[in-house]
């Protein structure tokens, strides 16, 4: 098990990068603590697999350092880093039995056959592979092959971390759920550092204790699933996490707050000072569809919005509204009345986020939160 630390790490596939747009990984510092279950979440092309390959040693970074337990490993080959990597498509030795696949890394280390047999049996039991040990790998299903790939990483006692690169992409949805649960059980049992790469927020939130969200070659937020949902540090996190994603409205500074068209949104004194003293290129407000209050008749200072569309999804409804020219999504509980034609809404102050140049403004801090 290892703490994985990235120091001033950056990577470009270009030999002569001329700007940030030429970098697959923009300069970053990050720590994955020993024994944690982490997810690296983001859309295709954001740099997830590149970062994973740098950690495992399959790729050398253009700059910066990778440290395991405080020791730089940039010059170490993948096998000397003691990293196990499970890829999107299962990698097994088709002509070998499941037993021999699992035993392969142990025999390469020269372990006694009695120890090999004991360890293979232990891992086979954990992964429910006992009845398949004598079966040739070529005859396995996709999920069985992926479990064998995972088992080869778990079978070694000296593995520093296991890296999963979208390992469930080719697995049926029901089996995905079973394997995610199995991975969680394995982590709790072995307490090994695991980093799970995915573009699926459900996979990330059900596996990981903490999620690193990547966008444009950067980790734009690192936190628990709840933190990412309730307080996104970047507009991309707000949009990407949740279904539907966060509502984002471009606004302009106004006395006492911000506004758009004829709508005014009051803000705290701290946020107002931030906005007044900053040189921002753009300002946005964001609020989750779940956090918008809705009434079907005028209520206090509620804003009036036009109901454009209502989608009934069984256990909840999604309303599309037009608020002074800005489209909004609102999530309504199944038992809540649906306004007809006109809705009256409010944005609770604790759930209304303000973003300057796409990053969250925090009234308690003196600068934008990166």
Language-model features, listed with the residues they occupy:
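ABC ATPase nucleotide-binding domains
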Residues: 82, 88, 92-236
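A short, flexible loop at the N-terminus of ABC-type nucleotide-binding domains that lies
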Residues: 1-6, 12-27, 31-34, 75-77
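Conserved ABC transporter NBD signature motif
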Residues: 64-72
């Amino acid at each position: 098990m290892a703490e994985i630390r990235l120091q001033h790490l950056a990577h470009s596939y270009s030999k002569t990068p001329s700007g940030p747009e030429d970098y697959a990984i923009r300069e970053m510092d990050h720590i994955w603590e020993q024994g944690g279950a982490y997810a690296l979440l983001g859309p295709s092309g954001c740099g997830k697999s590149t970062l994973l390959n740098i950690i495992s040693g399959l790729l050398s970074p253009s700059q910066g350092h990778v440290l395991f337990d405080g020791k730089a490993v940039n010059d170490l080959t993948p096998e000397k880093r003691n990293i196990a990597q499970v890829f999107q498509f299962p990698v097994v030795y088709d002509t070998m039995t499941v037993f021999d696949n699992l035993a392969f890394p142990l025999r390469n280390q020269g372990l006694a056959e009695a120890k090999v047999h004991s360890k293979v049996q232990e891992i086979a039991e954990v992964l429910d592979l006992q009845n398949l040990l004598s079966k040739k790998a070529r005859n396995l299903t996709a999920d069985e092959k992926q479990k064998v790939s995972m088992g080869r990483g778990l079978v070694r006692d000296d593995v520093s971390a296991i890296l999963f690169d979208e390992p469930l992409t080719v697995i049926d949805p029901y089996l995905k759920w079973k394997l995610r649960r199995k991975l969680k059980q394995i982590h709790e049992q072995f307490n090994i550092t695991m980093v799970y790469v995915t573009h699926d927020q459900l996979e990330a939130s059900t596996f990981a204790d903490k999620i690193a969200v990547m966008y444009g070659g950067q980790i734009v937020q690192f936190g628990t699933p709840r933190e990412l949902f309730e307080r996104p540090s970047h507009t991309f996190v707000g949009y990407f996490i949740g279904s539907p994603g966060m509502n984002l409205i471009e606004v302009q500074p106004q006395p006492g707050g911000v506004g758009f068209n004829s709508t005014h949104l009051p803000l705290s004194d701290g946020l107002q000072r931030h906005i007044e003293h900053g040189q921002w290129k753009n300002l946005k407000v964001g609020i989750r569809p779940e956090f918008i209050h809705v009434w079907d008749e005028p209520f206090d200072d509620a804003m009036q919005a036009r109901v454009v569309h209502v989608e009934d999804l069984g256990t909840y409804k999604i309303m599309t509204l037009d608020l002074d020219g800005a489209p909004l999504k609102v999530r309504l509980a199944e038992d809540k009345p649906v306004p007809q034609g006109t809705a009256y809404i409010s944005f609770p102050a604790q759930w209304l986020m303000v973003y300057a140049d796409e990053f969250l403004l925090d009234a308690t801090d003196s600068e934008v939160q990166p």
